[in-house]
Amino acid sequence: MEEGKMDENEWSYHGEGNKSLVVAHAQRCVVLRFLKFPPNKKKTSEEILQHLQNIVDFGKNVMKDFLGENYVHCGEVVQLPLEFVKQLCLKIQCERPESRCDKDLDTFSGYAMCLPNLTRLQTFHFAEHRPILCVEIKPKCGFIPFSNDVTHEMKHKVCRYCMHQHLKVATGKWKKISKYCPLDLYSGNKQRMHFALRSLLQETQNNLRIFKNGELIYGCGDARSPVADLKELAHHLKPFFFPSNGLASGPHCTKAVIRELVHVITRVLLSSSEKARAGALRLGLQGPRVCEASPFSRSLHNQGKNTSEHSGLPKGCLLYKTLQVQMLDQLDIEGLYPLYKRVEQYLEEFPEERKTLQIDGPYDEVFYQKLLDLSTEDDGTVAFALTKVQQYRVAMTAKDCSIMIALSPCLQGTSSDQRPVIPSSRSRLAFSVSVLDLDLKPYESIPHQYKLDSKIVNYYSKTVHAKDDTVRSTRFKEHEDCTLVLHKV
């Protein structure tokens, strides 16, 4: 960043989460990411600098090795003029969602992270004139717990995402339950993946967003009907997939365009990057490969068809690598929580050891190497407990990451430069795949995760599963009074 040339009018609001806010540059393919804090919990400039540097180091030394360097963009910490930051904050305030304004942008330290704009293709530093489409997917956890420490039998049958949906709707977080199940997307089976992606398009919640030329055009809003939204989305997407304009408008056009989008995303998700590293983890999928709550699986089950269709993911693709990192959670939160308590007890006795244990960093090669110890035999030591706690934090990070797929039509008669290309029915699309939201989950969040897990499972068991049992019981009772009488002929 060139300090003397910072103009807030060249930057626009891009989005925000619980802990940070992002602005994008109008011409250059870069974004600035600022930390956010509650008004009464300000941090010093030194603490903010260390926090941001830890994020960069974790991406560079841990996630790049696990996921592959082509997929992970670490960025760098930059120091900005305070006047620029304050003016920028004033400029974007009116664009922020009201629900996010409980925290303030850090305008005191001047530190931020400079990252590539992942809604653009990642082989260009400046915005291209050709149209660029970007699909952001938050796939969530792609496996069912296989740990023997799990006490709720339901957790061995239904995935966390599907169970959590019911609690979120009950508490008003979402209006309706999504048909999306992460296990369908991670199955590698194209039919299941297509169903999962269509389900995300019908009920995006905060798991899918679509950008066109860096501007959000779909997702993160439930005020309008999905049908109206999909019709408008198809209008935006038509030039990407049917450039000759051979399709008329109407419901058939909408279906054709959405079908093409789903097929292209599936192909991209199953593609491998030749330059990406193979990945250091070799964890086999041990739990069930089908979630009993998935509408796709239920439909097949009701038709008497095999529900265990699981083609498997290609080992070089990003979904496979993400799933491998997620499976560092070998013990589930139920098995992990007692180990967390062991570490906590040790820190109460020896608080000065917190730095030695690398709980707050540094996230270096030493930290990374300890994550590769996949032993599950507890020897009763703090070292074993700490390794499992750190693996759990990394796994939770992978369970909450986002995948960004950028697509752009290949111009006729031109080479694809360095970019891989995916064919669609009527066009060829250059693409890049990236992953973001890779901040290491905080050590302090483990007790919250333990309580939330219990809350999710208990609610699902008492309401949804109990209702299913009642329905099955009623069906049985309808027939139990029937008597077959045989008469001699």
Curated annotation (Swiss-Prot):
Annotated localization: Cytoplasm; Nucleus
Primary localization class, coarse: cytoplasm
GO biological process, one term: positive regulation of transcription of nucleolar large rRNA by RNA polymerase I
Motif (EXKPK motif): 136-140
Keywords: ATP-binding, Cytoplasm, Kinase, Nucleotide-binding, Nucleus, Transferase
Signal peptide region: none
Entry keyword Thylakoid: no
Catalysed reactions, as listed in the record: 1D-myo-inositol 1,3,4,5,6-pentakisphosphate + ATP = 1D-myo-inositol hexakisphosphate + ADP + H(+)
GO molecular function: ATP binding; inositol-1,3,4,5,6-pentakisphosphate 2-kinase activity; molecular adaptor activity
Tissue spec: In brain, it is expressed throughout the hippocampus (CA1, CA2, CA3 and dentate gyrus), inner layers of the cerebral cortex, and Purkinje cells of the cerebellum. In heart, it is expressed in cardiomyocytes but not in interstitial cells, blood vessels, or valves. Also expressed in testis.
Enzyme Commission number: 2.7.1.158
Domain of life assignment: Eukaryota
Enzyme class: transferase
Keyword set includes Transmembrane: no
Phenotype of the disrupted gene, per the record: Death during ermbryogenesis before 8.5 dpc, suggesting that InsP6 is required for yolk sac function and development.
InterPro entries listed in its UniProt record: Ins_P5_2-kin, IP5_2-K_N_lobe
Function description: Phosphorylates Ins(1,3,4,5,6)P5 at position 2 to form Ins(1,2,3,4,5,6)P6 (InsP6 or phytate). InsP6 is involved in many processes such as mRNA export, non-homologous end-joining, endocytosis, ion channel regulation. It also protects cells from TNF-alpha-induced apoptosis.
Family recorded in the similarity comment: Belongs to the IPK1 type 2 family.
Domain writeup: The EXKPK motif is conserved in inositol-pentakisphosphate 2-kinases of both family 1 and 2.
Annotated protein name in UniProt: Inositol-pentakisphosphate 2-kinase
Organism this protein belongs to: Mus musculus
Gene this protein is translated from: Ippk
